[in-house]
Amino acid sequence: MSAHDLKLEEIVNAETLRRKLNELADTADESYTSLPMRKVVLQTLKDALASGRANAEDMLMKDGGGTLCAKRLCYLMDTLIDILFEFATTRAYPTRNPSKAENMALVAVGGYGRGGLAQGSDIDLLFLLPYKQTPWGEQVVEYTLYMLWDMGLKVGHSTRNIDECIRLAREDMTIRTALLDARFLTGDKDLFRTLEIRFEEEIVKGTEPEFIQAKLAERDARHRKAGETRYLVEPNVKEGKGGQRDLHTLFWITKYFYRVKTKEELVKLGVLSRAELKLFNKAEDFLWAVRCHMHFATLKAEERLSFDIQPEIAQRLGYTAHPGQNYVERFMKHYFLVAKDVGDLTRIICAALEEQQAKHVPGFNRIFLTFSRRKRKLSDDGAFISENHRINIARPDIFRQDPVNMIRLFHLADRHGLEFHPEAMQSLTRSLKLINADLRENPEANRLFLEILTSPRNPELILRRMNESGVLGKFIPDFGKIVAMMQFNMYHHYTVDEHLLRCIAVLSEIEHGELKTEHPLSNHLITTIKRDRNLLYVTLLLHDIAKGRPEDHSIAGARIARRLCPRFGLTPSETETVEWLVREHLTMSMVAQSRDLNDRKTIIDFADTVQTMERLKLLLILTVCDIKAVGPGIWNGWKGQLLRTLFYETELVLTGGFSELSRAARDKQAREALAERLSDWPKEERDAYLALPYTNYFLTVSLDDQVRHAHFIRDADQQGRALVTMAKPHAFEAVTEITVLAPDHPRLLSVITGACAAAGGNIVDAQIFTTSNGRALDTILISREFDTDDDERRRAERVGKVIEDVLSGKAHLPDMLAKRTKPKKAARAFKVEPRVEINNTLSNKFTVIEVEGLDRPGLLSELTGLISDLSLDIASAHITTFGEKVIDSFYVTDLVGHKISNATRQGNIKRKLLALLGAENGARTNGRSPQAAA
């Protein structure tokens, strides 16, 4: 990269700046260290810094070069530090006849030493001394550092002599790594060269295994902290898996082991091919571009690519919308593909280290191998071997000789429980072009793949390796289209391909009985569908495969399933089942969470869709896996209870047992179960309590919660309290439950939800029940904020106290809500098109109003309040939150108990609700490019 490419003269003119400072010094009346002179020098340097950064940002916007920008910013800093240090040593604290001790080298270390910076990057400096520090040296260091700090820079520094550097590098791997990146800036160059030579001879030589092992362990620990997957939808560009630090780690390792200074030398050594070097440089350039834009856009050292800045970064990088994908999603897909490339490079370099050169270094193989190097054949043709519990290729040409071996490798690894040798994965990555239409249609390849997908062992692990190597996306091109695809919303925590793999992992865990407590029904049902278990694995792999297309992904996905299943070897009837499951994979979740399960019409309609018990079982398990694999905290016990209720109610219809008597019998059974748990209560009191809740309460609420509610209500009655709240944290589900007992009235739900919002509680779910004596028992789930249950319980009790104060008139709700009208920062990045549907076909008795919109504090209170103001009675409400989006369903009648059938009145209701929902959407673009949004 030439200076012409960098256009460094446009960043800062070193000679002009140096001359300006010297002229200021020559004409100054004050001492060079005086406060007035110091202010002049500082302002001159600050102006140059601001101008250089602005120029670097302008150039980045024009040429898009991330590496160019990082080098330009580094050059800017080099120039300012060089001139400042020169001023400090020749003007502020000059030495007429310096002794040997009064020499110093200023050295860039760490990230700054590597020669690239973003605007907010730390500046790590080493003031290198020949001996001990001197008074002159202390003055120079202090002057330089304070000037840099006053310029607003984050400067890390150390002042050491060479002996101290060597001793500390031997003891501390972080210091050793920082010195590995050391780069001379200014001062005594011979002093720096001495450090380089001694570092090479006394530290690096003979310690290669130790260093590499430490760096790989450090990388693994960093991944665990930042998130194991490289496909988190708000990735850390610097520290996350597949981010900049992974590239740094690779170069540290190769630099330490091969004694190279540049990546280009790795091609000459055979570690990387020219294509792989190009991949390395492209990944580095892209990550630098993203990181530099993030720092410029946020005016701080922002390393997390959060939802609220993704749209601006995508715009800066020039992404536009395509059919089915907005511009943010296209940008993030590119990001995740680059992260995947970084993973490929990691495997390639590890393979080269182990196989090409490491055998010449005593002890190196201990980094990778725990056991002796025993080999055994894994296949009759000798194409694969097991080497120290890892599968490897016996010859470099086995994939070219028979491309089916690219699938067979994974099949054998699964069957024998082997890890993958990096050499085998490297060879796979370099052979992807062999996967063509012939291989995709090969019956043997598809048979092997289906056995991998439906393996009784750990299919997710093998499929993950297939995906990481690129084989899965090439073998199933439709899957390749969703690799690294993110969905620009706060609900989905992972990319689409990562979600599908996690779905398969959940199913495998259910099948192995590992989720028996959390998912008892799924755990039971999986044992009854052995003949159809394969269909579930195929469905889970395919159910979101059509994401990112203009049409409904369920319908498009069903069409893809119809095409792929015969290729995998499924029969026509099996194909039909998978096609149906893919098309309906969202139905059970939607009905369970958004419909009244105590309404006969809900169950009848759902049963008409499902039609058979076999499909019902498959759909239930599919739904559980799908929800659970969305991300942490998405699944909770209440969703499980709703799904189980829907399953059991539908089972009665499909088996011919659905009747009011059956419901009554189940209600009776539930009341008897509760009576048994309350056996220590006096009979008269127990019977009176059991008559309070209506049937829907007993059919929806778990027995443990019923017992808890019973004691809660009993205690309130004994204390003579008509209004009381109770809090219960649920650590595993990342939610906290607040139960409210209060006299029922038309706007009660609106007041409760408003008070909750005013207290900072983000409502994610709610259950509403009334009792036969005119009281309401409402249970609200709010997002968890604290890690410990004690802290979270105290916080929830404060929320409960606010609810009590508002309901009792001690606090004024409108004033409280006015203080919390701003949506969360992340939510401000999104737009959800408001939608209101008024439907009289979903219930025989009620009109169902379904609203969809952008979540915001107090929205549920506003909705329920408006519905009450429209002279409607809410019989039940079903609140569902999908990240930034809410979908709420209200079962309503007019004040005399009739449906809302008048078209004019329906139009008025819809118009007012849409106005309320649209109030916060404003000009947000939901990730569409400005052109597309216009």
UniProtKB/Swiss-Prot annotation:
Short name of any one Pfam family annotated for the protein: GlnD_UR_UTase
HD domain segment(s): 496-613
Regulation of activity: Uridylyltransferase (UTase) activity is inhibited by glutamine, while glutamine activates uridylyl-removing (UR) activity.
Protein's GO biological process: regulation of nitrogen utilization
CDD domains reported in the protein's UniProt record: ACT_ACR-UUR-like_2, ACT_UUR-like_1, HDc, NT_GlnE_GlnD_like
Protein keywords: Hydrolase, Magnesium, Multifunctional enzyme, Nucleotidyltransferase, Repeat, Transferase
EC nos: 2.7.7.59, 3.1.4.-
Domain ACT: residue ranges: 737-818, 848-931
Domain notes: Has four distinct domains: an N-terminal nucleotidyltransferase (NT) domain responsible for UTase activity, a central HD domain that encodes UR activity, and two C-terminal ACT domains that seem to have a role in glutamine sensing.
Role noted for this protein: Modifies, by uridylylation and deuridylylation, the PII regulatory proteins (GlnB and homologs), in response to the nitrogen status of the cell that GlnD senses through the glutamine level. Under low glutamine levels, catalyzes the conversion of the PII proteins and UTP to PII-UMP and PPi, while under higher glutamine levels, GlnD hydrolyzes PII-UMP to PII and UMP (deuridylylation). Thus, controls uridylylation state and activity of the PII proteins, and plays an important role in the regulation of nitrogen assimilation and metabolism.
PANTHER family hit by this protein: BIFUNCTIONAL URIDYLYLTRANSFERASE/URIDYLYL-REMOVING ENZYME (PTHR47320), BIFUNCTIONAL URIDYLYLTRANSFERASE_URIDYLYL-REMOVING ENZYME (PTHR47320:SF1)
HAMAP family: PII_uridylyl_transf
Protein name (record): Bifunctional uridylyltransferase/uridylyl-removing enzyme
Lineage: Bacteria, Pseudomonadati, Pseudomonadota, Alphaproteobacteria, Hyphomicrobiales
Gene: glnD
